[in-house]
UniProtKB/Swiss-Prot annotation:
Described purpose of this protein according to its UniProt entry: Required for the formation of a threonylcarbamoyl group on adenosine at position 37 (t(6)A37) in tRNAs that read codons beginning with adenine. Catalyzes the conversion of L-threonine, HCO(3)(-)/CO(2) and ATP to give threonylcarbamoyl-AMP (TC-AMP) as the acyladenylate intermediate, with the release of diphosphate.
Location(s), subcellular: Cytoplasm
GO MF annotation terms: ATP binding; double-stranded RNA binding; L-threonylcarbamoyladenylate synthase; tRNA binding
PANTHER family on file: SUA5, THREONYLCARBAMOYL-AMP SYNTHASE
Lineage: superkingdom: Bacteria
Sequence similarity: Belongs to the SUA5 family. TsaC subfamily.
CC terms in the record's Gene Ontology section: cytoplasm
Native species: Salmonella typhi
InterPro entries: DHBP_synth_RibB-like_a/b_dom, Sua5-like_dom, TC-AMP_synthase, TC-AMP_synthase_SUA5
Catalytic activity of the protein: L-threonine + hydrogencarbonate + ATP = L-threonylcarbamoyladenylate + diphosphate + H2O
Record-annotated YrdC-like domain positions: 7-190
Protein name: Threonylcarbamoyl-AMP synthase
The gene coding this protein: tsaC
GO annotation (BP), single: tRNA threonylcarbamoyladenosine modification
EC numbers on record: 2.7.7.87
C-alpha cells in the first residue's frame, strides 16, 4: 500500500489527523512527524513511534501566530521581546514561550513552557491552514537514526504504509534554531 499524500491532497491529510494518526511531512530542513496537538491519543502514538519520553516536551509548528495563541502565554513579553520573535517569523526559528495551565502536559512535558514556530514552508503553511491549527512537529527519525530528508528515507525508517505528505524540504542543512522568547537564550543552534 502506498500512503504517499500528494501536495494537493489536504483533505486526505486532514482526515488522517482527525482520526488521530501521525503523519510525516517536509519542513524547512528535514521531514517532521506530527499530529493533532489536542489529541492525547495521537501524541502518545507519536511519542511511542519516536521512543521519546513525554517529559521532554514537544514543538508546535503553525501557519500563523494566531494558531499558536491558545497554547502559549505571550502576555508578559515586552515590545522588544515581541519584535525579536516576529522579526524571525515566519521562518526556521523556534521560540520557547510560557504556557498557560490549560496547555496539555502531553505537549509541555515537565516544563511550564512550550516550543513553537511559525513556519515559512509553503506545504506546511497550507497543511496547518487546512487543518485549522498547528501540528506537533518533531524530526522524522527513529531513536538513534539520523533525521529523514526525503520521502524514501521516511519509508526506510517508518515503513511503506506510513502516511507521508510528498514534497521537498526547504533545503536548510540544520533543524530549526531554538531560543527562549523571554531571554533570547539559544537552546539549539540552527
Amino acid at each position: 500500500m502506498n500512503n504517499n499524500l500528494p501536495t494537493g491532497s489536504s483533505a486526505a491529510v486532514v482526515d488522517l489527523l482527525n482520526k488521530e494518526n501521525v503523519i510525516a511531512y517536509p519542513t524547512e530542513a528535514v521531514f517532521g512527524v506530527g499530529c493533532d496537538p489536542d489529541s492525547e491519543t495521537a501524541v502518545t502514538r507519536l511519542l511511542a513511534l519516536k521512543q521519546r519520553p513525554v517529559d521532554k516536551g514537544l514543538i508546535l509548528i503553525a501557519a500563523s501566530f494566531e494558531q499558536l495563541k491558545p497554547y502559549i502565554d505571550d502576555s508578559i513579553l515586552t515590545a522588544a521581546q515581541r519584535k525579536a520573535v516576529f522579526d524571525c517569523w515566519p521562518g526556521p526559528v523556534t521560540f520557547v514561550f510560557p504556557a498557560p495551565a490549560t496547555t496539555p502536559r502531553w505537549l509541555t512535558g515537565r516544563f511550564d513552557s512550550l516550543a513553537v514556530r511559525v513556519t515559512n514552508h509553503p506545504l506546511v503553511v497550507a497543511l496547518c491552514n487546512a487543518y485549522g491549527k498547528p501540528l506537533v512537529s518533531t524530526s522524522a527519525n527513529l531513536s538513534g537514526l539520523p533525521p529523514c530528508r526525503t520521502v524514501e528515507e521516511v519509508r526506510a525508517q517508518f515503513g511503506d504504509d506510513f502516511p507521508v505528505v510528498e514534497g521537498a524540504t526547504g533545503g536548510r542543512l540544520n533543524p530549526s534554531e531554538i531560543r527562549d522568547a523571554l531571554t533570547g537564550e539559544l537552546f539549539r543552534q540552527g
